[in-house]
Amino acid sequence: MAYCIGFIVTEEAESEIITQEVFPAEVARREVLVQTVRPGETEEAAQNLLRAGAQALVARGGNFRDLQKSVSDVPLVELVMRTPDVLQALNGRVEDYDQIWLVLSKFVRFDFDSCRALLPAKVHCFRYGPVEEMLAFLASLDAPLNTLIIGSGFVLEPARLRGFHAVQTRNSPDGVR
């Protein structure tokens, strides 16, 4: 029997990259399983994937950190979000907005200060640890409605509830491979 890997992601679009673009044959053979989660559902998703036959788990950011505390019986692999992934989310969008906020987990490997000279002044960055910090930031953000929020799947809903446009950062297909 082939090895089975379970991916835990935060948005359906991420799931589609894995299932349709990167690993369609492996998904068809049930060698790759994917589960989309909301905040607080990571450990339950891991257990579901393990019951379904996953022999290793892949997650990123806070989900990966949560699983480090609770999963010890199978390999756990971190899917890392990097600078090119964040910059790709900006691609073609800068001109359309009055302000852009990169709302990124502290686990995203993105050095805003190093990129600052390449980005227009209307691009700002907020880094958060616990999800509660991100929620508090978005709740108090004083920005025009024509603001774009770029971040993980957990950022999208609270940003949209405030009336902001929101786009998710995604790992490139090469990064997932």
What are these regions (language model features)?
Residues M1-R177:
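Non-catalytic structural scaffold of enzyme domains
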